[in-house]
Design a protein with these regions (language model features):
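Structural motif
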Residues: 11, 97-98
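Nucleotide-sugar donor phosphate/pyrophosphate-binding loop at the beta->alpha transition
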Residues: 78-85, 122-125, 133-155
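A short beta-strand/loop micro-motif in the catalytic core of glycosyltransferases
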Residues: 99-100, 155-163
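Short His-centered aromatic/hydrophobic patch
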Residues: 101-106
């Protein structure tokens, strides 16, 4: 307590299905967030043997690494249901104020967690690294994934897209 007021720590959670995602793509964002005063947490599946080598490097960056049982496929229901439960526990345990979701399943679970935590004023950011319903995609992708993204957009505070086609599609969503 300083001068009679509490200083709140700011916690942000980065979520992706693959452990190497943060190491390969988010290091500069992590540094930027830390300079802004955020304590950075990273939730991912750390048990995939291919990605184990990055754990020490991520922790040396000052990032709190958390294993969740997230699967790369949205159709692995049991693992993803367990991952959602683990994600909600992290949000509550560390008083997470913002969650930045990456990868399709990370985006799905992160935004669903945001919906379940609306009473906490959790800010939900989703970076779509290319929607799966692009022109020329299989009919299943264009019909099912478009509808899923449209629904999940309601639980998204900030949507970041990386190309013009995705930007135009995102314009049809209600954030």
């Amino acid at each position: 307590m300083i001068g009679g007021s509490f200083i709140m720590e700011k916690h942000i959670l980065i979520l992706a299905t693959t452990h190497d995602f943060l190491w390969k793509f988010e290091r500069e964002d992590v540094k930027r967030l830390q300079r802004m005063g955020y304590i950075v947490h990273y939730a991912t599946n750390t048990l995939e043997p291919h990605y184990v080598s990055y754990q020490k490097e991520i922790q040396k960056m000052g990032v709190f690494l958390h294993h969740i049982d997230i699967a790369r496929s949205p159709f692995v229901w049991q693992d993803n249901q367990r991952a959602l439960h683990q994600l909600l526990q992290l949000i509550h345990r560390y008083s997470i104020q913002a969650i930045h979701c990456h990868t399709p399943v990370g985006g799905l679970l992160g935004r669903f967690a945001g919906k379940l935590c609306r009473d906490r004023d959790l800010i939900v950011i989703y970076t779509a690294h290319g929607f799966h319903f692009y022109k020329g995609a299989p009919l299943f992708n264009r019909s099912v994934y478009y509808q899923v993204e449209k629904i999940l957009a309601r639980y998204t505070d900030i949507l970041i897209v990386i190309n013009q086609e995705d930007y135009q599609a995102a314009q049809t969503f209600r954030l």
